[in-house]
Amino acid sequence: MFGKGLVKKSLLFFSGVSTMAVFLVSCGATRIWESSIQLLVSNDEATLADKSFSEMSYEGIRRYFRSQKHIELPSPNSSLLQDGNGLWKRPGRTLSDRIATFKNIKNDGSDVIVATGFNQQEALQAISSDDRRYLADKNDLAKVGFIFVDGQIEKEYNVINKTPQFRSTPLNISSVAFRSDDGSFLTGVATAVYLNLNQDYFLKKNGATNNSSQDLTVSGFVGVPIPSTLSFLNGFRLGIAYFNEVIYTHLSDAETTSDNKSNSSSASNSVLVQLKQMQGNDKKIKKIKWISPKQGSDNNSNLSIDDHKSGSFSSTEPRATTIINNLLDKGVSAIIPVAGPQVNLAVNEVARRKAHTAIIGVDSAQELLDINQDAPDKDQLIKGNKKIIPFSSIKALDVAIENMLIAIQKGSDNNGYKGFGYNNIGTVGTSSVGISEAGYEFLIDPVFWKTTQSQGKSMATNMTNLKRLSSDDTNTKKALKEVSTHKNGSDKDGIIGKYSNLLTKKSTTVTAVAQKSMTDNNSGTEQKKNLSEVDTKKKEKESKGKTQSNGQDSGQQNGKETNDIISKYSKLLTMTTMNNKVMSSKKQSSDDNSFKKTSENGDWVIKGDELTKKKSTELPAFAKGADYPTFPTEAVSVINGSTALDGKGFKWSFKQI
């Protein structure tokens, strides 16, 4: 499950932990490397050390060589790494260019090409197709393995009038797409809490040309509106909506450890306690409003995705700077830029204008990178790291790539990832998406209600069906209790897992947190079991053992508080049922083994305790969108029973030549 270990290993910073290092001898010339694995960046404008997509992908290769071969590859910002020197290449601009680059990498002696970004798909579909025009290319590259990052190979690609451009059987390709909406959902929830706990700071609207608003506001933009970027944006909006319509609505019913007269200092400092205290004072918790980057458009009932795109992933994109400054003019409280290196533009503009605005990181834990800066008037921030980037929505490309390489090498699954012939899915459950560690302290246990709703007011039996349980049962109260979420010393796997499992249930009437049996007054023991359920029986047994052995909450071990926040969120976030999907707008067939796209207008929000596609005052729906995928929650075979390429015989080597 997603936890501290993942985040720390995903930050792009690694110490010299290998038992064998590559020793470099200076000779005044560019070093040439011979590697079984090469990275192919997304386009000719991309660079390796981008603090984002390309760099995280390269780190996956580094992680593989470090863990499996005890070899330390050069760091991504090393001057010894240049385009075409044997470790990474740019792909070219056309279909034929990309196929030629595949062959060049093969001629370098590489066995596996890690091809990143949606731009690679057409070439990969071509060389795995039955199209006679590409038969020679297919045969030439048949013994080369490919990992397609941030997309999926389709059996029928680009279907127009029922005729596909390519029919593909990817015997030598393993792909991975990411449920980035899951990770950014967590980030949206944490952002809403972070802004509220720092209300005084963000309501000053420093740096704004119009600072009269007393709203906490957020916005975001993408570089190009493609499935992988829209997934981030819509998941973030859903997390904000979850705070507005569920957490905000039911906060007065929250049961906290302080309600049980706990003397724990950690309990008194927990975010749930602090939010309840705010509700009881003159300073009220605020719902979070979404504003448009377009000037003068905030009163419109509809939003356009066209106003939320910069048009490229260039680090110098002028439209990105315009979008950022438009939002700063409006006094926006937080921005999530899903546009690669353009997060750096956002940080620099906030610093230049001394704006009281948070920038939410994307892909890696960007709050730890050197692009981050101290927040203007940082001492006025009560909570958080006092930086412009407080935390990030993680898409752990490095974790996925490392696991896929290991799966290919050994010819069997590795940590939920499969090898050639499969479309893999990066989820919270496979430790591939989530929120960075700095955001953990702002995640609220989603199961915090203490009273039972009447049958007439019970919530719908879908995603937000978090039934309020009876507070007179000791085990129920213990299971529902919000546990401290300090940045240090707290394991959040439990809560994320609960969220994940809630949404991975295939039945619309059964969830991990709100089982039908609970509404039938099931025993407290059974309720506790349901609430603390995690992905494996081992974890469930361990949790039960902790409670029985020391009489304390199941989240305590060796005097150090842990909790199950991550587990709960994980259960909430990956439901395969159509009604519970975060981003589904067309009814799923009973066969969920396919990738589906929708171009319907709008995106999902939570309204009135239900997950629906409708407008709300705070988050109007997008009136114009682009295709985004609804992914299955586990790897899917796309080779129709054919025999995939065997990678166990690859060299799996790296050396200087």
Swiss-Prot record:
Official protein name in the record: Uncharacterized lipoprotein MG040 homolog
Family: To T.pallidum TmpC.
UniProt-annotated location(s): Cell membrane
Lineage: Bacteria, Bacillati, Mycoplasmatota, Mycoplasmoidales, Mycoplasmoidaceae
Species per Swiss-Prot/TrEMBL record: Mycoplasma pneumoniae (strain ATCC 29342 / M129 / Subtype 1) (Mycoplasmoides pneumoniae)
Pfam families: Bmp (PF02608)
Record lipid sites (N-palmitoyl cysteine): C27
Annotated InterPro entries: BMP_lipoprotein, PnrA-like
Polar residues bias spans: 294-304, 516-525
